[in-house]
Amino acid sequence: MGYATAHRRVRHLSADQVITRPETLAVEEPLEIRVNGTPVTVTMRTPGSDFELVQGFLLAEGVVAHREDVLTVSYCGRRVEGNATGASTYNVLDVALAPGVKPPDVDVTRTFYTTSSCGVCGKASLQAVSQVSRFAPGGDPATVAADTLKAMPDQLRRAQKVFARTGGLHAAALFGVDGAMLAVREDIGRHNAVDKVIGWAFERDRIPLGASVLLVSGRASFELTQKALMAGIPVLAAVSAPSSLAVSLADASGITLVAFLRGDSMNVYTRADRIT
């Protein structure tokens, strides 16, 4: 629920004039995530696809792995000033897990909140940063043609509708190795955009995401590589640079990591055998 954009009048200064004009802004709002009624974390996100975001987040945290691990996802009513009815503000979500699914340990998951720029920054311990995947993308035999990869960034840009209006959102997209775009999501946080597309697959019982490519609009960080690993994605591509830890994790887990995917060129850092 909620709106991805807001409007505000701004004063625009250029070399020859000063004018007041309307401007479209990307919305950033907090989302409190609860599991079985217990608060787990607060993330700063762009409203929209919240159910996908939360389920993708829980998958990346190793809490759930398959659709049947989640019973329900629902917005919570919350009393706020001017809203004495307790009606939902669409900024608090509760996930009810299936019997036997262990909820996250809130003592090590997040200390306070997750910023829109970094999802692991709020981790309470170094041990809580790394998760063990139930899937093994290193054994995925899928291959993808270099020309198919080169065409993906343009497809992603064309699908970034809110970015085109605001210039303020990251994007993530899932592709089949044949180049077909499966899903694209935008968010002010790059990790949220990835959680949303992974949550899209989770809701459709498509985890693990074998024979797929995850494309991100910015850099390839450790955290995004870990999310790809947790979802069983064999190929991670980024239009910008990778970090050293992202390359190390991709190498250790058998993920093909492609970065600087721009125009007619790319760098392949790990498992280059998948690129044909």
Swiss-Prot record:
Keywords: Cytoplasm, Molybdenum cofactor biosynthesis
Active site: C118 (cysteine persulfide intermediate)
One annotated Gene Ontology cellular component of this protein: cytoplasm
GO molecular function: sulfur carrier activity; sulfurtransferase activity
Entry's Gene Ontology BP terms: Mo-molybdopterin cofactor biosynthetic process
Recorded name of the encoding gene: fdhD
Family, per entry: Belongs to the FdhD family.
Role this protein plays: Required for formate dehydrogenase (FDH) activity. Acts as a sulfur carrier protein that transfers sulfur from IscS to the molybdenum cofactor prior to its insertion into FDH.
Subcellular location: Cytoplasm
Pfam families: FdhD-NarQ
The protein's name in its UniProt record: Sulfur carrier protein FdhD
PANTHER family: FORMATE DEHYDROGENASE, SULFUR CARRIER PROTEIN FDHD
Species for this entry: Mycobacterium bovis (strain ATCC BAA-935 / AF2122/97)
UniProt cross-references to InterPro entries, sorted A to Z: Cytidine_deaminase-like, FdhD
Top-level division of the source organism's lineage: Bacteria
Classification via Gene3D superfamilies: 3.10.20.10, Cytidine Deaminase, domain 2
